[in-house]
Amino acid sequence: MDWSKVYSYCERGGDPSFWAEPLNAISNGAFTIAGLIGAWQLIRSPRKDHALFEWLLVVLVIAIGIGSFMFHTYATVWAIPFDTIPISLFMLAYLGYALRRFAGAPWIIVIAALVGFYLTVRYAQGIQCSNELLPMTRGAGKRCFNGTLGYTPAFAALVLVGGVLLVQGHRAAGYLFAAAFLFLAAMTFRTIDLEVCTWTIRAGRGVGTHFLWHTLNGLLLYVLLLGAIRHGAPRDALPKAR
């Protein structure tokens, strides 16, 4: 187990203690709240199917909150998978869900899209900064866009799948577009966390903007859950028109 500390966010600075990132840690409650409200609405849903996949999405949202809380408190290398794995699983699961349940794509298309998405994310995560890019992307020991580039394929997927659903006239399209808007705002706050650190000093410590990344993501995941709960029933489980 690697106990090396990770100092990647403004709020932590160089403090190795458990509660060095109080806002970053507590704001993960947004994911737990989103998951619990989603579970409550799923229980109350009039759907006739068993909604097993929707329950998986709910569990993954709650797991994201728990894993991210662990990472922003322990802030060690061993805690990184607890933060990243639930996020990765949710992105893959929801993309497959949206393509299959919402868009009605055949399995071969769904599988190909998931493989392509995974490879695109891996590529985006490996993009190296150069000093010729925007100021916030300069090398100087910083991750490119503060590590946010790895999430851009997810934003693109929301927009593209939302566009397909819009053309199909599917009511879930609006949920994906709303989530894309929230995600764009969230990625912005994640990107500028270190850039604005000196402007957000309170009580002698930097606050940053990473907690807004959590808060907005909690809201967008709730929007995605709501779209799945309301409009994700299999076509043969939909009420018959009379």
Where are the regions a protein language model picked out?
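Multi-pass alpha-helical transmembrane bundles in non-GPCR membrane proteins
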Residues: 1-242
